[in-house]
């Protein structure tokens, strides 16, 4: 028992171990929101490889804390960000079938206008109180959370953090490319709702950020559209003459 305790205490001295543990816990919370229940806790057992990949995505963002002395505060900010996205998805799925994606940010003005149709006044008040409580909690952490004692030069501290973050990013990127290449996950989703449950919230949401649909053609311009319209008008005129 003492050996196990000693081993745990030893590995806990490594920065990335902290980041990995917090990322695993955060990924489980996110998936519980994604699946609208505690079935999210079964995700690592149902799809272990994909769970690790989603955790690495979150861990890449959590690794930002390694650049700061107020690490608990930064870990908390990143956690609030991911939980906020997952909670938004949870709320959206209660009123529509398609999950929350990056494209929804482009529609935020329209969403605010029709928010009353999907969320009651009481729910809006509760959400506002929750936001205020979270902000207050973050301010408290900023002021009271302990700072990391740094015994090395700032340049070495930043370089060490950068190396660790790059390693995590390369692990996430490499695993993502491998899973996409082997077909274990997809980047384009036929059924968005099923994809979120099968491939995880983190992967699907990040995919919606990176891939926002069909790219604009190089030939696309106002002049080109005008010429295309004229061609279609000419076709309609010729067709009417024949009839």
Feature names for model-found ranges:
Residues 179-243:
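Soluble catalytic regions of membrane-associated enzymes that act on cell-envelope
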Residues 2-196:
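Transmembrane and membrane-interface helices of multi-pass
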């Amino acid at each position: 028992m003492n050996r196990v305790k000693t081993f745990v205490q030893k590995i806990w001295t490594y920065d990335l171990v902290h980041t990995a543990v917090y990322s695993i816990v955060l990924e489980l919370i996110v998936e519980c929101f994604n699946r609208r229940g505690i079935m999210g806790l079964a995700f690592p057992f149902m799809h272990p490889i994909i769970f690790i990949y989603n955790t690495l995505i979150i861990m890449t963002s959590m690794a930002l804390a390694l650049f700061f002395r107020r690490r608990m505060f930064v870990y908390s900010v990143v956690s609030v960000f991911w939980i906020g996205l997952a909670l938004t998805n949870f709320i959206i799925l209660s009123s529509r079938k398609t999950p929350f994606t990056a494209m929804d940010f482009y529609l935020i003005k329209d969403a605010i206008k029709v928010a009353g149709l999907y969320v009651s006044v009481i729910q809006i008040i509760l959400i506002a109180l929750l936001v205020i409580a979270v902000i207050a909690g973050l301010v408290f952490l900023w002021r009271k959370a302990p700072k990391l004692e740094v015994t090395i030069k700032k340049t070495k501290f930043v370089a060490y953090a950068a190396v660790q973050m790059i390693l995590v990013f390369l692990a996430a990127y490499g695993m993502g490319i491998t899973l996409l290449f082997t077909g274990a996950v997809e980047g384009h989703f036929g059924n968005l709702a099923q994809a979120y449950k099968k491939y995880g919230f983190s992967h699907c949401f990040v995919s919606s950020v990176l891939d926002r649909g069909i790219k604009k053609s190089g030939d696309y311009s106002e002049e080109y559209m005008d010429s295309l319209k004229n061609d279609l008008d000419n076709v309609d005129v010729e067709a009417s003459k024949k009839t």
